[in-house]
Regions:
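Acidic, glycine-rich loop-and-beta core segments that form the ion-binding/anion-interacting portion
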Residues: 1-7, 11
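Non-catalytic, membrane-anchoring transmembrane segments at the edges
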Residues: 2, 14-33, 37-225
Length: 226
């Protein structure tokens, strides 16, 4: 009988960082808005104070995720991005939607580097390598768990693809990720129109069985650390 609040609503479809935070971790955003942003004065005390309040809110958001400099930088980056969007105003809205999406997606992934890096030095080294090159190819640990059984079967059926399976795995996971994030209805929207049928039950059972058979290990839920 409990109705849980929606927490994510296809955040990677966002056309701005401001919109991203209306779709990403919505319960945390609501908490910070009600308990930090509004008590600080919100947007009622002038433009400069509004910008400062935004920076404080996202600084706290970073610290909430972890007491480290990487999380602080991540939070301040998101705060600074939203201040910049406010300063830019309607001029940004006049840009084509595809360009606004690319800008937002690029920024989000840049900020995630700091979120996931063990320290600032590691984040800086990764960003430097991304600009200058020198990654040295795809690391095996990155793809070893992706579609392992499926590609083993593919290599048996078509040995000629064996030299390219690593690149095919990366292309498949990136393509599937983008497709899942950008194209179909998310689970929340899907449940609004979902009607159980024999076909949907069989499809769900097949996908569930495929997922179970594809297990390669246990991954700790990332938010267990927060």
């Amino acid at each position: 009988g409990l109705r849980l609040p929606v927490n994510f609503d296809s955040p990677y479809r966002s056309l701005s960082v401001t919109e991203f935070w209306k779709r990403w971790h919505m319960t945390l955003t609501a908490f910070l808005r009600e308990c930090v942003y509004f008590p600080l004065g919100g947007s009622r005390r002038g433009q400069g104070r509004t910008y400062l309040n935004i920076l404080v809110v996202y600084l706290i958001s970073g610290i909430w995720h972890g007491a480290g400099w990487t999380f602080i930088v991540w939070g301040l980056l998101h705060g600074a991005a939203q201040v910049t969007e406010r300063l830019w105003g309607g001029r940004r809205d006049a840009l084509p939607k595809w360009l606004r999406w690319v800008m937002t997606f690029f920024f989000l992934n840049l900020a995630w580097v700091f979120f996931r890096a063990p320290d600032i030095s590691a984040a800086a080294a990764l960003l430097k390598t991304a600009v200058t090159g020198g990654f040295g190819g795809i690391r095996p640990w990155l793809v070893n768990g992706l579609f392992r059984r499926e590609f083993s079967a593919l290599e048996l059926l078509a040995p000629a693809v064996r030299p390219y399976t690593t690149y095919l795995r990366v292309a498949l996971i990136l393509g599937a990720g983008l497709l899942t994030a950008l194209w179909p209805r998310n689970t929340v929207r899907q449940m609004e129109v979902f009607r159980p049928t024999v076909r949907s039950c069989l499809t769900t059972a097949l996908l569930a069985a495929w997922s179970i058979l594809s297990f390669t290990g246990v991954v700790t839920f990332i938010y267990s650390n927060f």
